[in-house]
Design a protein with these regions (language model features):
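Charged, low-complexity intrinsically disordered segments
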Residues: 1-188
């Protein structure tokens, strides 16, 4: 959950990709979406969604990776000169969301400090890093996921065109590899 990379859906400013992701849980509840999107930090956006989780879209578990991928792509391409640099600084090292309780989005260390879990967020970020390396266009069109009821504030979410200002320049930093013992694959 990294703040500092705002997203625009039309003229709606969303401060974090986590807020957009959480809002997408509730396409049928525009007031809940507004409350989530008003939050300034990723964590408070997530916490704002918690009381409403039982009202999540019926297919949430089936579509959450697709929606997170879409949110992260918007985050990257609307913050191209900064977020692409952050991704490139990871070089070719694994990106792991280390967590103490979420083995789906992250990976949990065991008593020997080996990480176990799906690491879905880390995998999506590595996928995005590879995509960013292969972008040579001046603009990118991000289509919405092909989902029923993909709405924000009661309106269909449009595809988004991002104009890339310039290719990011990267200052390489020294990194250490994570000790990943086992990671399970997930499907799109």
């Amino acid at each position: 959950m990294a703040p500092g990379f705002p997203i625009f859906i039309g003229d709606i400013k969303i401060r974090t990709s986590e807020a957009l992701y959480q809002a997408c849980r509730f396409p049928h509840l525009p007031d809940v979406q507004r409350a989530i999107i008003r939050e300034a930090s990723p964590m408070t956006a997530k916490m704002k969604s918690k009381p409403h989780c039982r009202h999540s879209r019926a297919d949430w578990d089936d579509v959450r990776i697709k929606i997170m991928r879409w949110c992260l792509r918007i985050k990257l391409f609307q913050n191209w000169t900064t977020f692409a640099v952050e991704l490139e600084r990871t070089e070719d090292f694994p990106i792991v969301e280390e967590s103490h309780k979420d083995s789906f989005w992250g990976a949990i260390p065991d008593e020997d400090n080996h990480l176990y879990g799906t690491n879905a967020l880390g995998r999506l970020l590595m996928e995005l890093r590879e995509e960013a390396r292969n972008i040579h266009e001046e603009s990118v069109v991000i289509n919405t996921p092909n989902l029923e009821q993909f709405l924000l504030f009661g309106e269909p979410i449009p595809r988004i065109t991002c104009r890339l200002k310039q290719q990011p320049s990267v200052v390489k930093s020294k990194s250490e590899k994570s000790d990943i013992e086992q990671i399970f694959l997930f499907e799109e």
